[in-house]
């Protein structure tokens, strides 16, 4: 009888041991990033008034309004943040420029940096952070244009969104 009980105990121990042998492996994956702390965005919203434009001056293909300046300012950039990249997005029309979402037809909006580079949707612009003031400055300009000519009377409106990344 003792042998029989020992056999059951031994069988139970082996059963438990084999259960632990068949346990599944567990993997813990840890992800993260070390990033630069963001600057304070001083220019949270900017409005550019193009004023009244005359349809007769926007009849021919390539005609455009005067440039209007707009500046994006970032301040309080932490030490260690050396560059700020702005990514531009907005509704584009078939010409690639920003689409006029107002009522005037055959009008597009063009955004450029101070070097004359066009910043259509999807474009990026990187500037250095000024070490002495811990700030970054994006001087930009915008205008209305008609790629194909034949602008009609109506309103002009576009929304351009900017997302910043820091390094």
Curated annotation (Swiss-Prot):
Main location, first listed in the record: other
Cellular localization per UniProt: Fimbrium
Keyword Signal in annotation: yes
Swiss-Prot/TrEMBL GO biological process terms: cell adhesion; cell adhesion involved in single-species biofilm formation; cell-substrate adhesion; mechanosensory behavior
Disulfide bonding pattern of the chain: 39-77
GO cellular component terms given for this protein: pilus; pilus tip
Record flagged with keyword Signal: yes
Record keywords, A-Z: Disulfide bond, Fimbrium, Signal
InterPro entries tied to this protein: Adhesion_dom_fimbrial_sf, Adhesion_dom_sf, Bact_Fimbrial_Adh_Pro
Cross-referenced Gene3D superfamilies: Fimbrial-type adhesion domain (2.60.40.1090)
Signal peptide annotation: 1-23
Annotated positions for site Required for stability and transport: 166
Family: Belongs to the fimbrial protein family.
Function description: Involved in regulation of length and mediation of adhesion of type 1 fimbriae (but not necessary for the production of fimbriae). Involved in the integration of FimH in the fimbriae.
Listed name of the protein: Protein FimG
Organism: Escherichia coli (strain K12)
Gene (name only): fimG
């Amino acid at each position: 009888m003792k042998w029989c009980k020992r056999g059951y105990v031994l069988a139970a121990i082996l059963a438990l041991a084999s259960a632990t042998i068949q346990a599944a492996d567990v993997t813990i994956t840890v992800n993260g990033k070390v990033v630069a702390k963001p600057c304070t965005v001083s220019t949270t919203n900017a409005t550019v008034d193009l004023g009244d434009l005359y349809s007769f001056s926007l009849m021919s293909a390539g005609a455009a309004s005067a440039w209007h300046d707009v500046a994006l300012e970032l301040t309080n950039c932490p030490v260690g943040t050396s560059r700020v990249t702005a990514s531009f997005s907005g509704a584009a029309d078939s010409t690639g420029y920003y689409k006029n979402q107002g009522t005037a037809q055959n009008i597009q909006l063009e955004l450029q940096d101070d070097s004359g580079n066009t910043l259509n949707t999807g474009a990026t612009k990187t500037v250095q952070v000024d070490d002495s003031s811990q700030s970054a400055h994006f001087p930009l300009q915008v205008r209305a244009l008609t790629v194909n000519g034949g602008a009609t009377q109506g309103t002009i409106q576009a929304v351009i969104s900017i997302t910043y990344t820091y390094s």
